[in-house]
């Protein structure tokens, strides 16, 4: 299991609930791999379950 979840777009991968996933592009773990979500982040709200707040969110960049 890759802690960064760097699998191909549309691919599948295993992601633990504590996964930090900075490159969550695969469909099987996309919704559980967003580790941060600042207020007003539209992209996070559309496809990621937020696990904390941060000013720097990889899925919002």
UniProtKB/Swiss-Prot annotation:
- Residues bound to a divalent metal cation 2 are 7, 13, 15, 26
Residues holding a divalent metal cation 3? 15, 19, 24, 29
One Pfam entry for this protein is: Metallothio
Where on this chain does a divalent metal cation 6 bind? Answer: 37, 41, 44, 60
The PTM N-acetylmethionine maps to 1
Q: Where is this region: Alpha?
A: 30-61
What's one GO BP annotation on this UniProt entry? Answer: intracellular zinc ion homeostasis
**Keywords of this protein's UniProt record, alphabetized?**
Acetylation, Metal-binding, Metal-thiolate cluster
InterPro entries associated with the record:
Metalthion_dom_sf, Metalthion_dom_sf_vert, Metalthion_vert, Metalthion_vert_metal_BS
> The organism sits in which domain of life?
Eukaryota
Write out the ranges of the annotated region (Beta): 1-29
Can you name one GO molecular function term for this protein? zinc ion binding
List of residues binding a divalent metal cation 7: 50, 57, 59-60
Binding locations of a divalent metal cation 5: 34, 36-37, 50
The entry marks the following residues as binding a divalent metal cation 4, namely 33-34, 44, 48
Q: Name one GO cellular component term.
A: cytoplasm
Annotated residues that bind a divalent metal cation 1 are located at 5, 7, 21, 24
Q: What job does the chain carry out? A: Metallothioneins have a high content of cysteine residues that bind various heavy metals; these proteins are transcriptionally regulated by both heavy metals and glucocorticoids.
User: What interactions and quaternary structure are annotated?
Assistant: Monomer.
The Swiss-Prot or TrEMBL record describes its family as follows: Belongs to the metallothionein superfamily. Type 1 family.
Relay the domain remarks. Answer: Class I metallothioneins contain 2 metal-binding domains: four divalent ions are chelated within cluster A of the alpha domain and are coordinated via cysteinyl thiolate bridges to 11 cysteine ligands. Cluster B, the corresponding region within the beta domain, can ligate three divalent ions to 9 cysteines.
> PANTHER family from the entry?
METALLOTHIONEIN, METALLOTHIONEIN-1G
What is the designated name of this protein? Metallothionein-1E
Native source organism of the sequence? Sus scrofa (Pig)
**What phylogenetic lineage does the species belong to?**
Eukaryota, Metazoa, Chordata, Craniata, Vertebrata
